[in-house]
């Protein structure tokens, strides 16, 4: 259950400098957030799917680590990502 290519390229061009800029922390956080939202919807329909729940928790942890890195490196970019994605922290 991955992201469609169109959604992925849309997120990359919105948060990255170019269409191939997938390594930027903002792009990674945005992609993780989209996958988390998709998995959350899946788990609301299938509450007993424990394997997907574990995947969701792993994605949340990855996003948290990238956000902590971004906060440590550049606080302004961190705040902008939180505002753009409506994440609370």
From Swiss-Prot:
Domain of life: Bacteria
Family annotation (InterPro entries): Ribosomal_uS15 (IPR000589), Ribosomal_uS15_bac-type (IPR005290), uS15_NS1_RNA-bd_sf (IPR009068)
Claim: Magnesium is one of the keywords in the record: no
Cited CDD domains: Ribosomal_S15p_S13e (cd00353)
A GO biological-process term: translation
GO molecular function, one term: structural constituent of ribosome
Alphabetical list of Gene3D superfamilies matching this protein: 6.10.250.3130, S15/NS1, RNA-binding
Cellular component terms (Gene Ontology): cytosolic small ribosomal subunit
Keyword presence, rRNA-binding: yes
Keywords: Ribonucleoprotein, Ribosomal protein, RNA-binding, rRNA-binding
Functional note: One of the primary rRNA binding proteins, it binds directly to 16S rRNA where it helps nucleate assembly of the platform of the 30S subunit by binding and bridging several RNA helices of the 16S rRNA. Forms an intersubunit bridge (bridge B4) with the 23S rRNA of the 50S subunit in the ribosome.
UniProt similarity note: Belongs to the universal ribosomal protein uS15 family.
PANTHER family: RIBOSOMAL PROTEIN S15, BACTERIAL AND ORGANELLAR, SMALL RIBOSOMAL SUBUNIT PROTEIN US15M
Subunit structure comment from the entry: Part of the 30S ribosomal subunit. Forms a bridge to the 50S subunit in the 70S ribosome, contacting the 23S rRNA.
Protein name in UniProt: Small ribosomal subunit protein uS15
Organism placement in taxonomy: Bacteria, Pseudomonadati, Chlorobiota, Chlorobiia, Chlorobiales
